[in-house]
């Protein structure tokens, strides 16, 4: 399906320690992604070369932006087709992975995928705002990550409630991250977060990426997260 040599070469360039067996796992991932995408809408990116760059390398760069301790717990909020966390779990099989999505059919795909490529994961069928208020998940994870299209302001409200104090929210963003961050500053603080650093990358197709590390420094107040409608109606400014 994908050009594994190209994937391995790119990983070498970015100093990502991907092994050949892991490239085989990602090849199977690409195959299943394209196959399932015909039944359910998972991604607009289906060309093999684009999958390598825009899905796999883009996701794996998360491990360059932050050191994930061995056995750390990671929840991917609104995971969709499994990006960025499933490629991260291929590279780091010690990570305790949880995949949260509001659409059950996406979770069915992810369960099949993880079984097929040998990635251990748990799935949670919930909206982010419900999961973040659930005692089973609230402030229970070392890390939360998201590569979603929602604004950073809203993503912070969705994701920081899942993170333990001392942990971090990892947001994967595009070239407009500075504007998003300026708009999100107060929301991040309100949720108990503090921006620790931003790592910028240029992908092989010249597209710009930023990975924002937001440290959880205090507990999220109990009234958060709110519903998407409330976030829109009363944004934290």
Question: Can you say where each PLM-predicted feature lies in the sequence?
Answer:
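Class I SAM-dependent transferase core
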Residues: 2-71, 75, 105-121
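Short loop/edge segments at beta-strand edges and connector loops
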Residues: 46, 125-127, 199
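Helix-to-beta-strand junctions that scaffold the AdoMet/dcAdoMet cofactor pocket
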Residues: 92, 163-165
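Short alpha-helix immediately C-terminal to the canonical SAM-binding loop
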Residues: 106-108, 177, 181
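Short "lid" loop at the C-terminus of a central beta-strand within the Rossmann-like core
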Residues: 129, 174-178, 202
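Conserved beta-strand signature within the Rossmann-like core of class I S-adenosyl-L-methionine
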Residues: 166-176
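SAM/dcSAM-binding transferase cores
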Residues: 182-237
């Amino acid at each position: 399906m994908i050009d594994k040599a190209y994937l391995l070469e790119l990983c070498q360039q970015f100093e990502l320690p991907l092994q050949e067996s892991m490239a085989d796992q990602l090849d199977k991932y690409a195959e299943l992604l394209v196959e399932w995408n015909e039944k359910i809408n998972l991604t607009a990116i289906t060309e093999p070369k684009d999958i390598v760059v825009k899905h796999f390398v883009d996701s794996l760069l998360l491990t360059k932006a932050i050191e994930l301790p061995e056995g750390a717990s990671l929840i991917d909020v609104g995971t969709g087709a499994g990006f960025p966390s499933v490629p991260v779990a291929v590279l780091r099989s010690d990570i305790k992975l949880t995949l949260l999505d509001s659409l059950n059919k996406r979770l069915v795909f992810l369960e099949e995928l993880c079984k097929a490529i040998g990635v251990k994961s748990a799935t949670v069928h919930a909206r982010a705002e419900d999961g973040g208020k659930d005692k089973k998940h609230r402030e229970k994870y070392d890390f939360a990550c998201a590569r979603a299209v929602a604004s950073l302001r809203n993503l912070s409200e969705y994701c920081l409630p899942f993170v333990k104090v001392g942990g971090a929210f990892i947001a994967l963003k595009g070239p407009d991250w500075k504007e998003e961050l300026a708009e999100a500053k107060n929301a991040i603080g309100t949720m108990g977060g503090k921006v620790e650093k931003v790592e910028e990358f240029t992908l092989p197709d010249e597209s710009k990426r930023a990975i924002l590390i937001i440290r959880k420094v205090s507990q999220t107040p109990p009234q958060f997260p709110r519903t998407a409608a409330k976030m829109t109606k009363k944004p934290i400014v």
